[in-house]
From Swiss-Prot:
PANTHER family: NADH-UBIQUINONE OXIDOREDUCTASE CHAIN 5 (PTHR42829:SF2)
Membrane spanning stretches: 9-29, 40-60, 89-109, 125-145, 147-167, 185-205, 219-239, 258-278, 283-303, 327-347, 354-374, 396-416, 425-445, 546-566, 600-620, 721-741
Topology term for the membrane: Multi-pass membrane protein
EC number: 7.1.1.-
Species whose genome carries this gene: Nandina domestica
Protein's name according to its UniProt entry: NAD(P)H-quinone oxidoreductase subunit 5, chloroplastic
Recorded GO MF terms: NADH dehydrogenase (ubiquinone) activity; quinone binding
Similarity remark: Belongs to the complex I subunit 5 family.
Amino acid sequence: MEHTYQYAWIIPFVPLPVPIAIGVGLLLVPTATKSLRRMWAFLSVLLLSIIMIFSADLSIQQIKGSLIHQYVWSWTINNDFSLEFGYLIDPLTSIMLILITTVGIMVLIYSDNYMSHDQGYLRFFAYMSFSNASMLGLVTSCNLIQIYIFWELVGMCSYLLIGFWFTRPIAASACQKAFVTNRVGDFGLLLGILGFYFITGSFEFRDLFEITNNLMDNGGVNSLFLTLCASLLFVGAIAKSAQFPLHVWLPDAMEGPTPISALIHAATMVAAGIFLVARLLPLFTVIPYVMNFISLIGIITILLGATLALAQRDIKRSLAYSTMSQLGYTMLALGMGSYRAALFHLITHAYSKALLFLGSGSIIHSMETVIGYSPEKSQNMVLMGGLTKYVPITKTAFLLGTLSLCGIPPLACFWSKDEILNDSWLYSPIFAIIACFTAGLTAFYMFRMYLLTFEGHLNAHFQNYSGKKNSSFYSISIWGKEGAKAIKQNSVLSTMNNNESAYLFSKKTYPIDGNVRNMMRSLITITNFSNKKTSPYPHESDNTMLLPLLILVLFTLFVGFIGIPFDQGGIDFDILSKLLTPSINLLHSNSNNSVDWYEFVTNAFFSVSIAYSGIFIASLLYRPVYSSFQNLDLINSFVKMSPKRIFWDKIINVIYNWSYNRGYIDVFYTTTFTRGIRGVAELIYFFDRQVIDGITNGVGITSFFVGEGIKYVGGGRISSYLFLYLFYVSIFLLIYYFFNL
């Protein structure tokens, strides 16, 4: 066992040979390197699998009751200061290692087929391997300096991955937005690290916790300064995990390839912020104001993320806001001190969200054979619908991921979210009400995504989307100004209508005529793909993409059982509590996670009822009515006879506009900060060029003309020099005489 821990330092370095070899190979032997590109994908999966096996062994040792292991190498700079580097293996590290490696392997296998058509295939796997290495280094770090180094590397990898298609202006802008937003958080994190070094004189976690506790007990530190430093540390996590108000980069990060989105949202970048708060939670717990701040940010993010997801049309951006909201639950749990529930939800959400993102990638991949390569179209749920019969395996996987995120038992997220909701009632009834209401919103917008994508008819075959005039396939009215107006006026919280009620879909069916079929055949050729097959209908993805989906389905079905909170009949399923026992004792020394069946069912009934309510409302509004209800007249008469119909339409329009425009937060940031900073920069530029440069240039020009004047005065005659000398002497004598009167 000791040998296992002694060699744990190698974990972050195992994936590095792939990006190094690819980089050197492309420089020295580019042709051979490109011809063996599948080998690099296999090597990436193999190396990460080795780490997964190693991490599983470490986790087993932790479950058996092994203590925390830390190995440190000291680098002495002088007698007063030294830097220590090493690695820390504890329950939190073990959980994160398993999470990163399992999700990473699934994403790499999936990417082999998904990126097979892309010319940047090798660059993609180099970035992915380096990103995995950076995240592994982050979770094994034993001090704040190491964490900050790998923190920046994770941010750099995310910048490269989000901007992978950097030739697209929107992708280049998205990676810059993510980079700048995270610089705000990173600056706060750096200030917090320096502040705690000033307070404690150490970067090590153990010293940091012990010294801070002693100083708090003895009153040896200014509590306001300590709170400020701890809040600055948390600012880094706010930006990394896309919490309010530094969440604006997350939806734009969807401009990268879909496997990148799955990795960032499940196991790397956004998980890094949660990991940082979990790692420093013993420090935060002694500062009540910081814990309240963490829970406040969490509950705001929960509600904001859910409301912003309500009216999104892009399937990946909808999932991005879902990630934002679900990580808000995790942050809320950490702020409440529910360490176990927070990590439990981080695990269950990671597998469910990886399944959903890879499922959305399969959907996008199938839609590209119909629509062509255009992310704006292939990711838009307006053009989907009726995919059940075309991609049945993807549909089943996506449905299970959706139900899991909705909180339907016995899927993974049900167990963790239910635990957070129960703890929230003990912490704050107001927070609990908001969290429960948002659980219903989550079920609503997730099932909305599912219904718009898989139910009804394939909308990409419609020749006319607005129902007003004919348009060509690549000038669909919804993408233009007129179509946008029609949608805004006639559709509320719905992505399509045909001059029908805002609440209901049209009963009409739309047969595909010959002109549309001919038009489709001429437009579906995808020149960027090596596979030149064309089809007027989507098709199921290849087995290489379906295999990770099926494995993640198993995780979604069964990973929740590691944290079942009840112990009956001598059967203890709660593996998670066994693994986290050393960390839980640090915060809740007298806690008992086990509950009986009656208490569990009572607590779960309320949350499941809320989830089913959200699903029912989504089905009522977004499921095609001709497949759900026989009595259409009854429903339509109910809608028309309502005396407050206009009032409710106005309210729903406000909600729709709020959601679709991202809560106007991006507009506010653009107007206030971006344009404000640019205005200040232009003012400084004007002052520099006109005032500073004007003074400098003015002195130079004045000196030049004075010199020119003197040049003409000095003609070489001694009498002229004598005259000027006597003239200036006389002037100085007069001045002297005047001031001495």
